[in-house]
A protein has these predicted regions:
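Conserved metal-binding segment of the jelly-roll/cupin
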Residues: 74-75, 227-243
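A generic structural signal for well-ordered coil/turn residues at beta-strand boundaries
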Residues: 11-13, 109-111, 221, 229, ...
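Transition-metal
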Residues: 1-188
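Residue-level preference for alpha-helix termini and adjacent loops
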Residues: 16, 62-65, 125, 204, ...
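Short solvent-exposed loop/turn micro-motifs enriched in small/polar/acidic residues
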Residues: 56-58, 108, 217-220, 226, ...
Length: 243
């Protein structure tokens, strides 16, 4: 795509194109290189009238091309208002933009429009409560979770799941993992089956049965979405998702 031949131990996972101050793209012509920020300052009409009227003289998006070799972490993006307040609050506390504990690196929200360049699977938002209950009740080891959800709000329920200790995670997940090991190896599990993605993620991320990740439970709570080449999906603020 970009004419580079990556070493086997250094795959190219992401290519970002945009005018974010932290790492703007560059434009190169016969006269040399220029940052996209500088180019747009000198040539704001390049943005187009409609964009300038709505967003001003800044590029209003960041284009990312991803090659997802392994499951990525679950993300949840703030609204514009939340991002602005969070950014200012961390500035007031003196948290540096380069600090690893920093949550808000800028004032912008991060809605995502994703277009599949090939066959692609992702997690997109919570299923309905009825769908979650049906999924949990279909698996004996997850029925205690269904009982929890029957007495808690989804927010309380999800917080408890994500804070579960290893013993609890083992009680929930190990029976499923053990029962599906052979069907998974034989290619007998459908890709819309959350059990498949639990086994796949453990294999891809080298997750050991004695060190389970609470995020594995999310395969039973979120919508598993399949996109074909050329199809797209929108992740608005507040929608948990993972590629």
């Amino acid at each position: 795509l970009i004419g580079l031949h990556s070493a086997k131990d250094q795959p190219c996972a992401e290519w970002w194109l945009g005018a974010h101050p932290s790492a703007p793209s560059e434009i190169e012509d016969v006269t040399g290189k220029q940052s996209l920020i500088e180019f747009l300052l000198q040539n704001p009409t390049a943005l187009g009238q409609a964009s300038r009227q709505q967003f001003g003289d800044e590029l209003p998006y960041l284009l990312k091309i991803l090659d997802v070799g392994k499951p990525l972490s679950i993300q949840l993006h703030p609204t514009k208002s939340q991002a602005e307040k969070g950014f200012e609050a961390e500035n007031a506390k003196g948290v540096a933009l380069t600090d690893s504990t920093r949550t808000y690196k800028d004032r912008n929200h991060k809605p995502e429009m994703m277009i599949a360049l090939s066959d692609f699977w992702l997690l997109h938002g919570f299923k309905t409560k009825a769908q979650i209950l049906a999924t949990l009740n279909a698996r004996p080891s997850l029925q205690p979770l269904a009982e929890k959800l029957g007495t808690q709000s989804l927010a309380e329920f999800y917080a408890n799941v994500m804070l579960a200790d290893q013993s609890t995670l083992a009680n929930w997940l190990l029976p499923i993992i053990e029962a599906n090991q052979q069907p998974y190896k034989n290619g007998e599990l459908a890709l819309d089956n959350p059990d498949y993605w639990v086994l796949y993620t453990m294999e891809a991320m080298a997750i050991l049965p004695e060190k389970l990740d609470a995020g594995l439970v999310c395969f039973y709570l979120f919508n598993i979405v399949h996109l074909k080449e050329g199809e797209g999906i929108f992740q608005d603020a507040g929608i948990p998702h993972a590629y």
